[in-house]
Amino acid sequence: MCGIVGAIRAHHNVVDFLTDGLKRLEYRGYDSSGIAVNTDGKIKRVRRVGRVQLMEDAAREKGISGGIGIGHTRWATHGGVTEPNAHPHISGGMIAVVHNGIIENFESERKRLEGLGYRFESQTDTEVIAHSINHEYAQNGGRLFEAVQEAVKRFHGAYAIAVIAQDKPDELVVARMGCPLLVALGDDETFIASDVSAVIAFTRRVAYLEDGDIALLASDGIKRLTDKNGLPAERKVKVSELSLASLELGLYSHFMQKEIHEQPRAIADTAEVFLDGGFIPENFGKDAKSVFESIRSVKILACGTSYYAALTAKYWLESIAKIPSDVEIASEYRYRSVIADSDQLVITISQSGETLDTMEALKYAKSLGHRHSLSICNVMESALPRESSLVLYTRAGAEIGVASTKAFTTQLVALFGLAVTLAKVRGLVSEEDEARYTEELRQLPGSVQHALNLEPQIAAWAQQFAKKTSALFLGRGIHYPIALEGALKLKEITYIHAEAYPAGELKHGPLALVDENMPVVVIAPNDSLLDKVKANMQEVGARGGELFVFADLDSNFNATEGVHVIRAPRHVGKLSPVVHTIPVQLLAYHTALARGTDVDKPRNLAKSVTVE
């Protein structure tokens, strides 16, 4: 949520970078944007509610230019969606600040600063930061780095901050605690951003800041950096693997459409570690073998779509590896009394690796005595891998659409690989079993491509869904989490109310909702629960409900009045949930198209949830 950019450029106008960078961060979610630039010794600011383009147009009209500046896309947390609440915030014409995160003690800090004579023009917690730094700056004789050092000592909460001063045209100071922030190095120019997508068009050399870091930047790089203990530190500069092409639409109309169709390649790339090297613990880290041999159970913590991936993994972990597994929503886990088990593996799942609730849940688990942790995420050098003892990166590539697609299916691949690896370590996988699992994984991208070929039929269904106000999704066993994911996708981007239930729970309440106006989507592959699912479908049909069935070629379903059937490719084995994810993604996408909603930037939602 929110996006930060900033730059010091020795030979170029920063406005070009600031506006381009903010546009590349639009996918994170926002409601307003702004930039502040030091122009001839004065800080000039432009802010607008709405799209970044509106703000950029205003900046061009005002002729703003300069060699140092900061920018921000805001997602409202404190105060409404208004221009005065948009960032950057300026204190006394001297200090300009952009901020991602939440300052939990901002009310007491605001009262303190008001007592010192500072006037507030907004309802935000960020203005507290600007005035606090300005106060310290005045007290210490104009040393910006030290002013930020002193000010952040007073803040409780999570933040990523970038600061410029009117009389320091060659200094940009940044600080990080709990929210992502990176420094990128070019030729006589230095950039900062919330994620690498904002800078990749300008440089690929990136250093990721860690919690507690404060850095002083100039056009020729990092001049000073201290860690959480206030000690001098260095951060390794790496070359980003992200390609600029992955951030462009190409021939597609929307990023979600592009990312749905990229899944065969993303799945193949993620599976490669298991197909080339086998299901070995070393795929997860050098200490994984001893950890996997010692654990007695698994706890998975995640939010949103990643939580549904975790629910799917529970079936694999218990059926393949025979290891007791528990799944919890991270935002619930971190606030309850937990019975800790030092021999339990804590797994966290996050596309960004920066989801705040998941990060804090992991820290909580470790504080209780959990010794072993594994993160599965899509972003190199993000917070969760750094906090975890083991890690496996998915290879989904950049995911721009707010509604997750390829990140979800690659998480499933990684979790399946984990289940087989644990089973192998525990002596539960024969050579024949491993060969079978390997072949299932090898064939998966092809099966997913066959499912994508069903798009015209699914698009036709979407025309009917577009007229509805509610929908019900049903699944059984390992396909129940896919029903949950389908309902989430539909509500996220079409704004149609959708719920998902285990099909066996119909008679315990949801059946009361069924009538001729309620479409009921059923995930119905040919597995051991198929007859049970058919019985549940009869219950829906008897109440006049209209059934939309995603079956497979062996399910023996026929379309009749009130029953629509699309047959996905039959994928024998444990990975059927991955294949059946594709149709529910396409259904949501084409229904959103038919309803005319903003597919890639649905209302009220953000891609990276870095606040509570």
UniProtKB/Swiss-Prot annotation:
The enzyme's E.C. designation: 2.6.1.16
Domain of life of the source: Bacteria
Domain Glutamine amidotransferase type-2, residue spans: 2-220
Residues at the catalytic site: C2, K607
Enzyme class: transferase
Alphabetically ordered keywords of this record: Aminotransferase, Cytoplasm, Glutamine amidotransferase, Repeat, Transferase
GO molecular function, one term: carbohydrate derivative binding
CDD domains on file: GFAT, SIS_GlmS_GlmD_1, SIS_GlmS_GlmD_2
GO cellular component, one term: cytosol
InterPro entries xref list: GATase_2_dom (IPR017932), GFAT (IPR005855), GFAT_N (IPR047084), GlmS/AgaS_SIS (IPR035466), GlmS/FrlB_SIS (IPR035490), Ntn_hydrolases_N (IPR029055), SIS_dom (IPR001347), SIS_dom_sf (IPR046348)
GO biological process: carbohydrate metabolic process; fructose 6-phosphate metabolic process; protein N-linked glycosylation; UDP-N-acetylglucosamine metabolic process
Cellular location(s): Cytoplasm
Catalytic activity: D-fructose 6-phosphate + L-glutamine = D-glucosamine 6-phosphate + L-glutamate
Keyword Cytoplasm assigned: yes
Domain (SIS): residue spans on this chain: 288-428, 461-602
Keyword Transferase carried by entry: yes
Gene3D superfamilies: Glucose-6-phosphate isomerase like protein, domain 1, Glutamine Phosphoribosylpyrophosphate, subunit 1, domain 1
Biological function: Catalyzes the first step in hexosamine metabolism, converting fructose-6P into glucosamine-6P using glutamine as a nitrogen source.
Assembly mode: Homodimer.
Protein name (Swiss-Prot/TrEMBL): Glutamine--fructose-6-phosphate aminotransferase [isomerizing]
